Each structure stands twice: as structure tokens, then as C-alpha cells.
Amino acid sequence: MIDCCHQHGVLPIVTLHHFTSPRWFSESGGLRRADAAALFAAYVEFVSEILHDVEWIVTINEPNIAALFAGMHDKPAEGEDPISVQMALAGGPDPELAPILAAMHHAARDVLRARTNAKIGWAPATQAFMPTEGNEAKWQEVFYAWEGVFFDATEGDDFIGIQSYTSQPVDANGPVPHPPHPDNTLTGWAYRPDALAINLRRVWELKGIPLLVTENGIATDDDNRRIAYVTGALSGLKSAVGDGVEVLGYCYWSLLDNYEWGSYGPTFGLISVDRAGDFTRTPKPSLAWLGEVAADNADHID
């Protein structure tokens, strides 16, 4: 895949862990194994043989969500979606796993710096948490548990990956679930293109490390709405850059409609896929539109 990207003029950004782990690893303790960091480093050393011409590497995708999933193990009732947003909001990332994931990230970074010339970072999920009136202290607590502790691990990184979709209010009890609303996306998330700018500004102020938008997008069956969402997100990004936030690039999630949050229902893609037939791929208007935006570096986005 890396070679194919280069052959077609595509700059690959390689993520080494995106939620999926070997079964033997998961069944023998997974992230709670004492040697998790050493095993991850060994894996990274093995795959580094094909990363010599890769310029950008994300060690772990959304480590805070990985810690959330691990903490939810065995909790869902029969028939309950184990990765539903409502279940996620019931708790938070397992605090015992944050230092383990950080150690895995740092071990991988050491290997990659010794064996490649790539820029290295990781990509926590960002929720653009916002305090409701009088709940600033709870917001600080929630932000650190969900995101801040994972940003602590970015010291010495070349960049931080920003994964942004929506914003989440925080009241005295913690994150507030999104109520049903006609504007919600197909994942049930609030329609908040402004969340990207909130996250960019917040993380830049917190860390001062260059930022790469590794995921931003919307699950919708209305492609005009997709274009409107990305327009709003990029407008906020440009405003943040104008105020001094260093943003290295922007990646839309995702190229294809794919398996998302337990089903093929939420359609994030710029290209649709006929999964009931012959898997024909049909570009949506948003694909050409985003290509034009990229070609002029979003100059016509206000």
C-alpha cells in the first residue's frame, strides 16, 4: 500500500495501531500485560523495515478510546452495542491504562527514531469538551481524564494528531449525552463543525507542538451537508492558523463509506460502496469538491 501511494503521488500517513490487536495478545491480558510496551516495540521494529520512505507515522490511533474500550470489557449486556456512544459516556478511559499506552507510544517512538527519518506522533480523540455554567472544575477533571493525560505523553513528539468530530458539554456529573435532535449526524453526534477549531486552539495552547488533523468528518447521507460541515471546519481551521496555531495538514475521514461503530450504517465517505452488490465505488460530489479545496489550499474558504 505504501508503494502504491508513492506511485500515485499520495503521501502516506501510516498508523501502526488502530484499535485492532492480535487475538493472542488480547486473550493473554492485552494492554494490561507487563510486557505490553516491549511487545509493541518489537512489532514496530519488525514493520519499520518497510517504513524507510514514510514521512509521517502515528504510533497509536485514539489511545484514550483504546483505554475506554479496554475498560468496558465484559460490561455490555447481551444485545447491547459495546461501542455505542451512550456506553462510552457512562464511564471514561481506564486511568490504569493511560501510562501503559504512553509507554507503548514512547517505546515505538524510540524504535522509529533509530530506524527511520519519519515525523512521529500519536492521535488522541478530542471531544471539544465545554463546561456548562458553574461546572468549570468538573470540566477540568473530565478533560484531563479523557484527553489531558494523553497529551502529557506527547512531550518530545514531532506532531500531535487531532481527531475531531463533535463537541460535548460537561455538567456536574460529567459529559452530557447528545439528546435526540434532527441536526444530529448518523452516529447520533451533535452537528458541530466548529469543534475542530476548539480542539486545535486548545491543544496548541496546552502543548505548543505542531498539529496534524488526522481525522475530521461527518456521518451523513446528505452530501451537501458533508460539504457544509467540512467548509465550517476548515473555516475554523484557517482562523486558528491566522491566530498562530501551527497546523501541518488536514485529513478527511473517510475516503470510503465503511464499517463504522458496529455497522455500515454511518456513512462518512467521500465515495459510496455498493456492499449489497458488486462493491461498485461511486464518487460523491464532495470528493471533487474537497479535491478543489486541497488544490488551492482552501484559499476560497472564508
Language-model features, listed with the residues they occupy:
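Non-catalytic scaffold segments within catalytic domains of secreted glycoside hydrolases
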Residues: M1-D302
